[in-house]
Amino acid sequence: MIRLIFWPTLVLGLTGLTAFVLTGITLVPTTVALGPCLRDFTSPFWEERASPLASTTFEVGDGAVRVCYGRPSARERVVFGELIPYRQLWRTGANEPTRIYTNRTIELAGVRLVPGRYSLYAIPDTNQWRLFITESVTHWGNDLRSGTRDKDVGVGIVPADTTADYFETFTISAEPAGDSTLMVLEWERTRVVAGVRAVRR
């Protein structure tokens, strides 16, 4: 599969592939390249961010998944229910939308994703979150106009638990779970777990 991917600059060495940006567009075989975690071109690279860009990469079957996201910190604020209101759509991070890259077909929170690039949004609630996955990846994080939502590919519902550990900074990590993987979202004293598994081609 070949997809049109918009990049703001030259990208080299995507898992062994050299990709060149011409007029802002790169032709990247999504079955080969996960892609790098890049800032939006409107955000100057030399400016320090309060919520730095981070990534986590994990194996799923014979493929891999990469999650790129901004990491906001609590800074003595009440996060869920105040800073991040319950039952309202959230970009699941900060700045750019949280992006998911996969080079094989997977299910994330029950939503089937073919190889490609996606954005992840959430509606947090006290005991469960709704995860929205969209094919729109070139917008700013809080740009939720109809054109963005029209590209939704699915919604998954996952449990939200309270933990004894306190996470000052929003963190996305991965934990093995038998034949699948758990994508774990933690911030403040909230822990949300979404299952990720390989789907047979």
Which stretches of residues belong to each language-model region?
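Primarily secretory-pathway and cell-envelope proteins
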Residues: 2-83, 139-201
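Short structured motifs
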Residues: 52-53, 86, 101-102
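Mid-length scaffold segments of soluble, non-membrane domains
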Residues: 89-143
